[in-house]
Structure formats: structure tokens, C-alpha cells
Amino acid sequence: MEVYLVGGAVRDKLLGRPVKERDYVVVGTTPANLLAQGYRPVGKDFPVFLHPQTQEEYALARTERKTGPGYKGFEVDAAPDVTLEEDLQRRDLTINAIAEAADGSLLDPFGGQQDLARGILRHVSPAFAEDPVRILRAARFAARFNFKVAPETLALMEAMVTAGEADHLVPERVWRELERALGESYPRRFFEILRACGALARIFPEIECLFGVPQPRRYHPEIDTGIHTLKVLEIAAHLSSDTQVRFAALTHDLGKGQTPSHEWPHHYGHGERGVALVLTLCQRLRVPKAYQALAVQVARYHNLVHQAQELRPGTILKLLNRVDAFRRPSRFEQFLLACEADARGRSGLENRPYPQANQLRLAFRAAAAVTARPLVAAGLRGEAIAEQLQQQRIKAIKQAVHTERG
């Protein structure tokens, strides 16, 4: 029985990145032998075991044969005579098909180290095309490492999309990969790769249709709404590691994809149109409610936030109430970050100041300091409390904004 460290742990060690978890492949043994040594079985579709002391995963070397559409149609062979190279050959990318022996030596039959050095994502074998999830994984690794996809791999991904393989992706898996991609260092690369192979139109049509839609050059020097959207996502990634903020940034302008072409380059009412599209996207991918709620707010109100310095105190208070700032101050901060990303996600304007966010923060703090307790203590009841609370908060906002403007 031979044991090798495989996959992401080897890759990340070679890249000098922290290793979060270790997976091992075991060659030349059987499930019964591992059970006899105290390993605990956990794999449903193929033999995977947990080490009795470390609880790390040990999988029997295996081969996989495609038997049906999608990512579940596989027949697995984990016999003792399956070799290490055969196991590595079933893996998706060469950078994930490197093994480390117990003595520290590396086994790299598919040139993964060379591709790591060159920053290239390359498929190991034509079997890459048997699992549509690999389209998403390749794009996600591009978002993590900022690597390029090898031309032949991109061509294979395009062929998979043309063959309809991407249509077999289940919503939960798409969302899982999207959420992970949003948390990577270069999330815009995920969408660039999907668009390059044609998968964006199949998986995220609401985003694909933004490309080629013009905006006024005065406000958007980049003109193209799709390019703007990816720039906003890029800025959001610099502003915050919060994937909810990044998702809201990604979806803030979906409504522009539905603007009648005769109205271009203007997009009147795109905020409300965008809300409907955000809800459709979230329902289709079964996006968690927290992501959806923030994305809806940003789609609906981002233009109003950009006008914050021109808003009257009463309008500012209405905005604070509509985004539920007093009950959800943390989400209000997420909301402002996504709006700032939109304002700065424009060619040549990436570093411009965004005083609107700080003005709304000041207004919120001033209004939040006004509570109903003194009003209740003074004997007010019901609607009288609400009316007085509103008036006092408007007054507090007016004073805070006036002081800020100097």
C-alpha cells in the first residue's frame, strides 16, 4: 500500500500558499484493508476514508468512466491495481494532478509544475469534457490565481457548452461555484472565462446580455455595460472581502440589459427593472436570502445614493428607512460599499473620492442617535411617537449634513 498527498495541497505548497486541507490517495489496497486499520468510510459514490487519528481524507486510487449526461453519470473503478498515474489522469487540471510521495518527491506525469510556473490552466485529458462542473472550476481557478486558460482547454470548454453539457449543471452547484469565485482575489476573471467559452450566456444570461449595451460616455467612459459591471466587481473586491457585497456589485445594473434599444444610451427606470431580474436570478440559483436582500436594495437605490449630496434631509431619512438601516446597520454598510464600487467602477475614475457614502454614514449616525425613549417618557403614544421621531431625526440629519458641508 502506497500513500500520496495529492491535489490542492501539493499545488498550494508549490505556490507558497497556505495549505488548508490535505487529501491523500492510496494505491494498492482495498476498502477492507483500510477498515481493518481503523479508517472510517465516508464516501457515498466512491471509496473515501477518514484517517483514525488525523481525520484527513484518504481515497482509494480510482478511474472513472462516463456513463450518462451531467456530472453524476460516472462508473467508478477503485480496484487495487489502479495506478497512481491512472488516478491523476482523471483529474481536471494539470496543476491539480501532482502527487507527493512520503519521502517528499513529486510525481508529475502531466506537466503541472510547468503550468504552475507559467500561470496556465490546462486540462489533463479529454475526460475533462465529461464533467460540466469543470467549466466552472476552471473559471474559478482563474479567479483565484489570475491564471490564463490554455487555448486548447478553452476550445474544449467551448465544445462542451455547444454540446449542451452546461445545461446539465444543477442550480446548487452553480451557486456553490459562484459564491466561491466571488470570494477569490480576481472574481472578474470567473466571468471573463465563462464568457470566453460561451458558458456565461447559458448559466448567467442576465449578465451576458449586458455586454454590447451602451451607456452615456459622460458618466461611463468605458461605455459598455458589461465591461462596467466587471469593473464594479473588481472595485468591490478591493473594497471588501464580503461576498454579499461583491454579489450585489455584480447584479446592480441587470436592468440595463432590458432597456429598449431605442432608448440607448440612457437607461431610465433600470433600477426597478433590475430588481425583477435579481429576484429571477436568485430564485433560479437558490441564492441565500441575505445575498438577495442586499442585491435588491443596491439594484433599486444605487442611483439615489449617488445623488446623496443633493438630497433633502427628509429624503435621506426615507432612504434610510427603506433600506432598513436602523434595524440592520451592518447591511447598510454593505449597501454603501456596493454603491461606492458602482461609482468607482468606471474607466479612469477608479480612485475618485465618493463623499456620498460618508455623508449617508453621518446622517445615519445622527438619526440613529434619536430614539423613541424620551418621547415615550414624555407621554406620547402611537402615531404621535412616530411623527415626532421622524421630525427629530430629520432635524438631526439636517444638522449633521450642514456641519459636514461646513
Curated annotation (Swiss-Prot):
Binding-site positions, Mg(2+): E21, D23
Keywords from the UniProt entry: ATP-binding, Hydrolase, Magnesium, Metal-binding, Multifunctional enzyme, Nickel, Nucleotide-binding, Nucleotidyltransferase, RNA repair, RNA-binding, Transferase, tRNA processing
Entry binding sites for ATP: G8, R11, R91, R137, R140
Residues noted as binding CTP in the record, renumbered to the chain: G8, R11, R91, R137, R140
Disulfide bond positions: none
GO biological process terms, semicolon-separated: RNA repair; tRNA 3'-terminal CCA addition
CDD domains linked: HDc (cd00077), NT_ClassII-CCAase (cd05398)
Database matches in Gene3D superfamilies: Beta Polymerase, domain 2, cca-adding enzyme, domain 2
Taxonomic superkingdom: Bacteria
Required cofactor(s): Mg(2+); Ni(2+)
Enzyme Commission designation: 2.7.7.72, 3.1.3.-, 3.1.4.-
Pfam families (alphabetical): HD, PolyA_pol, PolyA_pol_RNAbd
InterPro entries for this protein: CCA_bact, HD/PDEase_dom, HD_domain, NT_sf, PolA_pol_head_dom, PolyA_RNA-bd, tRNA_CCA-adding_enzyme
MF (Gene Ontology): ATP binding; CCA tRNA nucleotidyltransferase activity; cyclic-nucleotide phosphodiesterase activity; magnesium ion binding; phosphatase activity; tRNA binding
PROSITE patterns: HD (PS51831)
Keyword Protease carried by entry: no
Stretches assigned to the HD domain: 225-326
Miscellaneous section: A single active site specifically recognizes both ATP and CTP and is responsible for their addition.
Domain-level remarks: Comprises two domains: an N-terminal domain containing the nucleotidyltransferase activity and a C-terminal HD domain associated with both phosphodiesterase and phosphatase activities.
Family: Belongs to the tRNA nucleotidyltransferase/poly(A) polymerase family. Bacterial CCA-adding enzyme type 1 subfamily.
Subunit record text: Monomer. Can also form homodimers and oligomers.
Protein's name in the database: Multifunctional CCA protein
